[in-house]
Amino acid sequence: MLDVEIKDQRLVDFHKQSKPHAQDARIDMAHPYILVAPNGARRTHSDHPALPVTLDEIVATSAACHAVGAHGVHLHVREGDGTHSLDAGRYLETIAAIKDTAPGLDIQITTEAAGLFDVATQLACLKQVAPEWASISVREIARDPSLAEQVYGTCAAQGTRVQHILYDTDDAALLAHWQAQGIVRTGQVDRLLVLGRYATGQISRPTDLEPFLTNGTPIDPWMVCAFGPQEHACLTHAAHLGGDLRVGFENGLTNEHDTPWADNAASVAALISRLKGDVA
């Protein structure tokens, strides 16, 4: 038990270290933590020619986004044919390359099923990669409740920081239930609130955040991502409420006028500029 408690403290320490603006962000909304999500599980070059698919493209995009102000990257890797992958070898190779090319950039791996992988495969990925940070959908883990304790216990034991993916208030309620039961461990409190995932046309709006705020703003740390041309408007709204932000081609390819961003770095830079302008 003591070992798990020590590792839980390491998760808290990692959060403090990886959020250089953690304290200031509550005061200065121009500087929330920014996590770039450059590709996702499904989009390809046919969706945008600058969407990174290969290892070299992912590494170059991560470095470019770091250079313009992103603090971390939400990492998806692909098979040779471009399909979504949870292959540990591909993850480890890509993580090493990003660390070499963009030192100081936080790396969060996804465990997204994307209709391809079961919970056992997601758990195996976590064990084999042993990442510093991983995003995990409570909805996906609930497909096999018998493995839920192992998923979160593994992360606690190996020092993997968890960000819970929440698509709606039912997911939030499930997370709270698992926390009360001790399935989700102490210190595993980070949440990503996904706005408009199931909205018509998958178009997010700032008001999509409201259901998550019925009991006030979430306990730190919380982050928001949003789909479609109002992506930056949604993120700016979240920043003013104290949230951190996930931005990139996984969720949005264009600005509010439906003009495509040149690349992920352009979207990150525009968001940062908008945030600074809003508090100027």
Regions found by a protein language model. Give the residues of each.
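N-terminal small/glycine-rich loop or linker at the start of catalytic domains
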Residues: 24-50
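Alpha-helix-loop-beta-strand connector modules within alpha/beta enzyme cores
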Residues: 36, 55, 83-110, 154-159, ...
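Histidine-centered catalytic micro-motifs
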Residues: 36, 59, 68, 72-82, ...
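Active-site mouth loops of central-metabolism enzymes
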Residues: 40-57, 110-119, 140-141, 200-201, ...
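Glycine-rich, proline-tolerant flexible connector loops at the mouths of alpha/beta enzymes
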Residues: 46, 71-94, 253-256
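Active-site beta->alpha loop and helix N-cap motifs at the rims of alpha/beta catalytic domains
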Residues: 55-60, 82-145
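A structural motif
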Residues: 67-70, 104, 131, 242-243
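Catalytic alpha/beta core domains of metabolic enzymes, predominantly
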Residues: 133-249, 260-266
